[in-house]
Structure formats: C-alpha cells, structure tokens
Amino acid sequence: YGFWSPWGTAALPVVNVPGGAITLTAEGGIEAALSWTPGSFDYYLVYRNGVAIAKVTEPSHTDAASIGGVRYQVRGCYDNSDNYSLSEAVEITVGTDNVRLYDMERGEWLHFLYDSSAHRSTGLSLSQDIQYVQLSGHTYPVAERSEFKSRALRIACVCADDAERQSLRALLGHLTCCKTPEGNMIIGYPASITENSDDFFSTYSFTIEQIDRKEEINIDS
C-alpha cells in the first residue's frame, strides 16, 4: 500500500537576456533579399511567416522560394546559451513581371521573355482526389474526399541562342522553382522537356508538378 500527496505546483521561470538589437531590412522583387545588423551572435535563424527556413552565420540571406506578401523575422542565437534577440517583423511583396525559373541546385535564375505566339500562355492545373462510391440505398454515389492534391504549371518558352538552350536543358531532373506574373509558384522537377526548332529559334515546353517539400529546418541541428 502507498500514500500519495496531492499534486504540487512549481513556478519555473524562463528568463531571456537578449543581446544587441537586430535591425532587419528586406527588399522584394523576384526574390527576397534580407540583411540585418551584425552582432555578437554565433548564428541566426531566418523565419518566413513564422516558420524557420534557414540557419546562417552571416548577417544576410536570400530567399528564392517565396511569392506574394511575405513576413520575415531574424533571431540571433548563441551556441552555449539559450538567450536570443529577435528582430521586428518586416513585410514585403515578392513577384515577377515574366515567367521566371530558378535552378535550385545551381542557384541560377533563368529569364525567358518570349513565347512562339504573340501572347504567352502558361497553364495552371489544380486537382483534388475525390473517389465516388455507389452504396446500396443511395440513388447517387457518395463522394469520399482524400487529402491528396496536385498542382502543376505548364510552361512554354523560346530560346534564341545556344546559351539559353543549354541553361534550359540543364533544368531536366533539377529541383526548380517556377514563378509567374499571376502570383503562382511551383517547386518541383521537370521530368521531360519537349523541343521544337526551326531556322530562327527553338521552342520548349514542359510541366513542373508541385512536390511535398518540407521547408522548416531543425533549429537544434
């Protein structure tokens, strides 16, 4: 037999002693260019919309994988202490006037202004997996909606010289970020590229499908 005391309560104070102030500056455009005042910190955590996306040691970071209105913050941290400093949040808009492709493995932007037609056409496909089951006692099928979705961009562009052709062909099988003027962004792999050439230029078409990509980093690693 044993006797148990009532549950007790204890206050566990958590005290943060911040270091120097961090002043964050962010510039929008095709990508987000971040810079901040350096301090005596060992490393910095970069947050986009509340999610830690990068751990860096230099007082700057470029985020190519964002679109639209974005909110950034930077946290200065120490290796041997849990103390930190947090910058004020900065909001910017990231976008593009033309279809832009970013080779995330080579760190290179590709800029294609032209299409084979007078007006560029870019196709966006969205789908949600819905299964229909015919059950006894129901006149119409019952819909079962799963969590699976797909999102893909169909891109067509023109290359007028060999350097552009080689850059585009090099995207095959590379993790690629595609942004459009309509505010769409897809990150995935071009699995196939179709090329048609004449005496003047080469026309390329391909599809990039959104992959399940975890951006949040492990801040303890």
Language-model segments: residues:
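Beta-strand-rich modules
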Residues: 1-3, 63-83
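Pro/Thr/Ser/Gly-rich low-complexity, intrinsically disordered linker/stalk tracts
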Residues: 2-40, 79-106
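Non-cytosolic beta-sheet module surface loops
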Residues: 36-38, 65, 159
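Short beta-strand elements bearing conserved aromatic residues within extracellular beta-rich modules
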Residues: 43-46
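Short beta-strand segments within Ig-like beta-sandwich modules, predominantly Fibronectin type-III
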Residues: 51-58
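Exposed aromatic-hydrophobic patches
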Residues: 60-66, 156-157
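Extracellular/virion structural assembly segments
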Residues: 90-221
